[in-house]
Amino acid sequence: MPTLPSPASPSSPPSAASSLPTSPASAADNQPHQRRDIAESFGGDAERYDRARPRYPDALMARIVAASPGPEVLDVGCGTGIAARQLTAAGCRVLGVEPDARMAELARRLDTGVAVDVARFEEWEPGERQFDAVVSGTAWHWIDPVAGAAKAAGVLRPRGLLSVFWNVALLPADLTGAVADACERVMPDSPFDFRAALTRPAAVPYRAILDKTADGIRTADGFGGTEQWRYDWEFTYTRAAWLDVMPTQGAFTRLPAEELAEVLEAAGSAIDARGGSITMPYATMAITAKRK
């Protein structure tokens, strides 16, 4: 399993990199939170998801802990508990909210200190519970940006922290091209715009999601100004390790086995041409705000 090092001194990723659409950010409707079929598909292989998905930079976790007025954290769309476990290790007490019962069950099993309520965040009933921080790791795009921000404001204590963040893999153009070619062959009707990913500037990955998130926070009117944090780092994957990551991405979670195998073979061949491994630049990007 790729265990990620803490990014000690971030450096800018190569300008040739592209961001593969691992969520429906480039879908025609640009409303990923309405795609419940994709949002709740990750539990089909929850153990692979937890094994293969990258962790978040230690520096980001430390900054969240430092900015939070206390240790009580709500993790929205917690999945298998990747960010939740990192935060509990940093001394926080974490409650997760997760719409997929399969993901929630694994999160509880992997860390008995993490409780998880199964619900869509917009419909979740918090009762009298309040929190010092609300976080969301690579999941906020599945939540209505205005309703989600309003819900977060409602459960945060005064000056509580909202921090939502994404790990964005900046794939080299040769790998992205090989994957896009295969995807267009096997998924001609996909809502994901794979070809557009080839020309998306690496300097602004997930820009539409980040802008929509910030706009939602402003519209909800429960927070002060937003800040954007960014951490650049890289990790070297073997061929097998990267092919373990790919089926956990939203573009591929519902793909039939035969079509998925064709996409993975294309990616594997591109990695083989690079000598059997690939050093993947990542940008971990966060939008944060303090409750009024």
Label the model's feature ranges.
Residues P2-P5, T22-S68, G70-G77:
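Conserved class I S-adenosyl-L-methionine
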Residues W124-V134:
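A short acidic, Gly/Pro-enriched loop at the edge of an enzyme's catalytic core
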Residues G148-P158:
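A short glycine-rich, Lys/Arg-flanked "PGG" loop and its adjoining helix->strand segment in the class I
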